[in-house]
Amino acid sequence: MFLKFCIVAFAICLSINLSEGAPRSGTIYNFAIIADLDKKSISPKNDNNYKSIVKVGELIEVGDKYSVKMKKEDHEIFTKYAYKGRGAELSEFLIYKWKLYTFDDKSGIVFRLKTNADLIPWVTLANGNGDQTDGFKAEWATTKGDKMYVGSTGISFTDKTGKLNSNSLWIKEIDQDGKVQSLDWKEQYDKIKSAMKIPNGFIWHEAVNWSKLKNQWVFLPRKCSERPFDTKTEETIGCNKIIIASENFEIIKSIQIKGKSINRAAGFSSFKFLPDSDDQILLALKTIEKDDKTATYITVIDITGRVLMPEMQINSDKYEGIVLLKSTEGFLKRSQ
């Protein structure tokens, strides 16, 4: 009987290890984060190369306690694709159709990141309604059904010429063949502001996911204010809210996160639902960019706003995308 129990237990452990996204032994989650280095992405060798960095880590769950262990190695990735001398400013990480993608918020290019660290351009997203000459400022991405959805900050502003710029109110729907459709999301973004009772203010979005299990949208805003958007003050504020919206945005809830932020200017840049949590537990990155200084924090919260792991700083650079991986063994190892 004891032998039979051991065999069954061993089989269960194997099944956990082989399940995509499942933690080893139910306690360790592998993840990777990707950097937006801004102007530091430009190669100092002046060889038309642009660089980002991927780092990997482990989220360790013991009972109802969580901790994070980051690995020291920097996985450098390069591209020659750029827009006006800027490139590889990568803002999100997403698995779609069993492939890993990342998004350049300067060129609008959606890259596939291969396991050998090659960045392969897949599609280029034109700004706004898709009939623009510049690239889409991609800041968030998720999957819904068979499609990939890519969005921007969700704010409009008056440019230097006095013209209203609403390009960031559009989102992109991409199918598995790379066909892109531009969708006007002004109404959806306005409904979120109304639900937060700041109809005349602004909400800066960088962390959005569709929950297939709950059939709802989940937003962790990076910045929010009851005042209109102002470039002079936006660096000084973050946002400590969770927004949950029904599929058609007819029902929207704004939830206050109960823990205090290390820095009030830090805001959410990316998150993923933890496997086997019924989309109730979120592993999230927060970033800060203020006075030419940057930092990245990581935290675990639940969908009710309860903090399960307080924020901890994991890097002095700005990492704006996170993804959960089955394994990081051999991840981004260049072939010799």
Curated annotation (Swiss-Prot):
**For this UniProt entry, which residues form the secretion signal?**
1-21
Q: Where can this protein be found?
A: Secreted
Q: Which domain of life is it from?
A: Eukaryota
Q: Which reaction does it catalyse?
A: a ribonucleoside 5'-triphosphate + 2 H2O = a ribonucleoside 5'-phosphate + 2 phosphate + 2 H(+)
Please list the cofactors this protein needs. Ca(2+)
Which tissues does the record link to its expression?
Answer: Salivary gland (at protein level).
Q: Does the keyword Metal-binding apply?
A: yes
List the record's Gene Ontology CC terms alphabetically. extracellular region
Residues bearing attached sugar chains per UniProt: 209
UniProt key word Hydrolase: yes
Q: EC annotation?
A: 3.6.1.5
Mark the transmembrane ranges.
none
An example GO BP is: proteoglycan biosynthetic process
Question: Enzyme group, top EC level?
Answer: hydrolase
Q: Which InterPro entries match?
A: Apyrase (IPR009283), Apyrase_sf (IPR036258)
Q: Which GO terms describe its molecular function?
A: apyrase activity; ATP binding; calcium ion binding; calcium-dependent ATPase activity; GDP phosphatase activity; nucleoside diphosphate phosphatase activity; toxin activity; UDP phosphatase activity
Alphabetically sorted, this entry's keywords are: ATP-binding, Calcium, Glycoprotein, Hemostasis impairing toxin, Hydrolase, Immunity, Metal-binding, Nucleotide-binding, Platelet aggregation inhibiting toxin, Secreted, Signal, Toxin
- UniProt-listed PANTHER family: APYRASE (PTHR13023), SOLUBLE CALCIUM-ACTIVATED NUCLEOTIDASE 1 (PTHR13023:SF3)
Regarding protein family, the annotation reads: Belongs to the apyrase family.
Function recorded in the entry: Facilitates hematophagy by inhibiting ADP-dependent platelet aggregation in the host. Cleaves adenosine triphosphate (ATP) and adenosine diphosphate (ADP) to adenosine monophosphate (AMP) and inorganic phosphate in calcium-dependent manner. Triggers proliferation of host peripheral blood mononuclear cells (PBMCs) and IFN-gamma/IFNG production.
State the protein's name: Apyrase
